[in-house]
């Protein structure tokens, strides 16, 4: 008999002081067994989504984990998904959005963790931009995290991030933070698109499955061009996590799993992901594992071979349980 799963909404005031952050919790519909005994979760998994998407795209992965005993939650960042007042604001972030997003992630963790016993293990799963947020988050609030899965990450050279940040902030001053620069966007996500030969769309780089690409394009909550304020935030993030100091502030005893496709341009087809692995090891993180999936692009949770990824992540979490 299939487990009945329910979703519930959560909302709170963003650390920008104005936006309402919208989130989702996936959990079993029943909190007690047939004999009346409470149904205790094996752990909580908080999903930190990527750029120009929203957390409900992770529904299949979340349900997979709930069926295996976990509670799953996630929120739409400022400028994303259902956390915007209207769709014209998608992709609009302030230039100081880094700290806001990190603290909003922590706010959701505080809210959801309070619902369960203190001993319930808490995992963070960050994908793409969410992987950069997660890495910066661990440097600030990593204590008490049972483990982190860093998915679809990369390692931008620090000088490149700083140059991009300088340009984005210059445009913020001249045009305002909500201005959208096709030139800056071409330097950013456009660089990923150019790495895919014989591409049919500008977002073929996210997945080898055309149906996933088409669904992304058709989703009104996906694909918005980042404002120059958004790019200032993004390059602020990539610049911070490229530093040794950031990795050294991470908890050394929390296990980390790095996963990515070996055809993912965000991770330089594995090269950048290996640099992150080496960075974590050099910083003294005791348990770091890395797995690259042959032939997969950026969204490994949506690739035709995603079942292997789901199983690998769940098995890793099971081993990380105290």
Language-model segments: residues:
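Alpha/beta-hydrolase-fold enzymes
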Residues: 134-221
């Amino acid at each position: 008999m299939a487990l009945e799963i329910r979703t519930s909404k959560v909302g709170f005031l963003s650390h920008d002081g104005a936006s309402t952050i919208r989130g989702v919790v996936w959990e079993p519909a029943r909190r007690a067994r047939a004999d009346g005994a409470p149904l205790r979760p094996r752990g909580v998994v908080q999903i930190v989504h990527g750029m120009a998407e929203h957390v409900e795209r992770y529904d299949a992965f979340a349900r997979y984990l709930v069926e295996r005993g976990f509670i799953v939650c996630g929120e739409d960042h400022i400028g994303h998904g259902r956390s915007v007042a209207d769709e014209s604001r998608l992709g609009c972030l302030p230039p100081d959005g880094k700290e806001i997003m990190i603290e909003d992630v922590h706010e959701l963790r505080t809210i959801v963790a309070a619902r369960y016993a203190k001993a319930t293990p808490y995992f963070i799963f960050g994908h793409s931009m969410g992987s950069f947020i997660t890495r910066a988050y661990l440097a600030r609030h990593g204590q008490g995290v049972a483990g982190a899965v860093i998915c679809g990450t990369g390692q931008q050279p620090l000088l490149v991030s700083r140059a991009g940040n300088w340009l984005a902030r210059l445009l913020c001053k001249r045009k305002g933070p909500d201005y959208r620069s096709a030139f800056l966007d071409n330097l950013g996500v456009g660089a990923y698109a150019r790495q895919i030969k014989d591409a049919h769309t500008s977002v073929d780089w996210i997945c080898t499955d055309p149906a996933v690409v088409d669904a992304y394009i058709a989703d009104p909550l996906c694909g918005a061009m980042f404002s120059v304020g958004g790019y200032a935030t993004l390059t602020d993030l990539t610049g911070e996590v490229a530093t040794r100091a950031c990795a050294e502030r991470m908890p050394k005893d929390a296990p980390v799993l790095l996963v990515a496709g070996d055809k993912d341009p965000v991770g330089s087809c594995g090269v950048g992901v290996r640099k992150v692995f080496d960075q974590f090891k050099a910083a003294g993180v005791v348990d770091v594992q890395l797995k690259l999936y042959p032939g997969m692009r950026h969204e490994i949770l949506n690739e035709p071979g995603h079942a292997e990824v789901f199983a690998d992540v769940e098995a890793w979490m099971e081993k990380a349980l105290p």
